[in-house]
Structure formats: C-alpha cells, structure tokens
A protein has these predicted regions:
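Conserved "landmark" site that anchors the functional core of diverse proteins
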Residues: 1-237
Length: 237
C-alpha cells in the first residue's frame, strides 16, 4: 500500500466533488467542505481538480508513505511536519519511502486538505468516493494509482510546478488570508434592528465549536429583532 494512517484524527475523511442528484431520497451529497482549497491542492500536484483528496480536521491524522510521492497541503494551517521538518502549504512537496507526516497545531482555519499525485484507490458509490458514514482510522491503507495516460505516479514536473509558485502565493494572499465574508441577505434581514444590521456589517465574529458540514455557527455580539417573533426551520441550500 502506498500510504497508511498511523494515528487517526477527528472526523478525517476521503472526499471528492460529491454525489449529487440523490438528495430527494435522503442521500447527502458530501464532497469537499472547502471546495477552493481542495481544488488548489489537487491542481498543484497535477491531479484533476475534482480528484479524491484527504479532508482533515484538527487533531488531524498522521500518515506514513510506503512509496515516493508528490503531495500538497492546502486550506487550514495545522503546521504540517514531514519527519522533523515543517513544510509549506500550497507547495508541491516530494516525499520518500518511510517518510511520516504529522500536524502539530491549528494556527489558521478549520479544514485542511492533503493531495497526493495520482488517484486514491477507494470504492466508489453513486459516482463518488466521498465518505459520509465513516472516517479515516488507524492502520487504514490506500493505494495511489496513476491516472490514465500517466506513465508513473511520481511527478517529473516539480520545477514546472514551482515556477507557478508566485501565482499560488497571490491566490493565497488575496483569498485564503482574507477575513471578509460575502453574504446574501435572507428573509429575516429586515426583521433586525438598524443597530444589529450595523453590528453584522462592522463587528468581527468567530466560528463556534457547534459548526459542522451543514453550516457554520458564529459567535459574537448579540443581535436584536425589531419585533420579537419565532421562526420555523427552513431549507438549507
């Protein structure tokens, strides 16, 4: 096997673009939680942008590589360490046989992605390899197989990939380091007082521990309604 989990994390899974078209019968689409970071990690190693990828949350899983590979880590910064050396995000990294990968602490962000050049060999269901009922466990092993048309898994394009590092850094600077969130006002927006609307637009909020794949719960200044009322639950899109 090409890669093995030597210590499981918390709710780490294998994800791809997800399975759509089955929500009407109660099957969740799953898929990347942070679509942009997952696609970026895949593209950097030369994979199709919607290829399967390891989605990690802190404390994250630890890995051992049984073969040489090209990897990339994107998304949240959990201080990735290859053997005893810290490695950069959004950068193609060459790993050797018996190298180990650990994540030390959550510095920024909630979800990180580990991409490996090649196709992660895992069972597919309804045209997707995304997990929704299981997580990565200690001693899980995965083969990494070449894509059709590739002669070998290991990348020969590290220099070419590195030449695009300036563009990657610009993406990281303008997107991943931004603390601003765009939003579309919903039906309840006009029920808020003017002071509360101003608070939302001007005051900082943090994500709470109650956040999950259905959505983020924010914690910050309290908000007030013009008129106290209750709300029925509504669809999530």
């Amino acid at each position: 096997m090409s890669i093995q989990i030597i210590k499981q994390g918390i709710m780490d899974t294998l994800q791809d673009k997800g399975r759509y078209g089955f929500q009407h019968i109660g099957i969740p689409p799953c898929g990347y939680l942070d679509y942009l970071s997952a696609q970026l990690a895949n593209v950097i190693v030369g994979n199709p942008k919607e290829a399967p990828i390891f989605e990690l949350h802190f404390p994250a899983s630890s890995f051992i590589f049984n073969e040489a590979h090209t990897i990339c880590i994107s998304g949240a910064n959990f201080v990735p360490v290859l053997n005893d050396k810290s490695i950069a995000l959004n950068t193609p990294i060459q790993v050797c046989k018996n190298d180990t990968l650990h994540f030390m602490q959550p510095l920024l962000g909630k979800t990180s992605y580990l991409s490996i050049k090649g196709n992660i060999d895992s069972s597919s269901w309804l045209n997707s390899k995304s997990d929704f009922s299981s997580q990565l466990k200690t001693n899980d092993q995965f083969n990494i197989i070449a894509w059709d048309g590739d002669n070998k898994i290991n990348s020969d394009k590290t220099e070419e990939q590195a030449s695009h590092q300036c563009n990657i850094n610009e993406i990281q600077k303008h997107i991943f380091n931004s603390n601003e969130i765009r939003f579309i006002p919903g039906p309840q927006w006009n029920d808020l007082t003017n002071e509360s609307i101003s608070t939302i637009l001007k005051q900082p909020f943090n994500t709470s521990l109650n956040s999950n794949r259905m959505g983020y719960t924010l914690k910050g200044p309290s908000l007030q309604l013009i008129e106290q009322k209750g709300y029925l639950s509504s669809a999530v899109t």
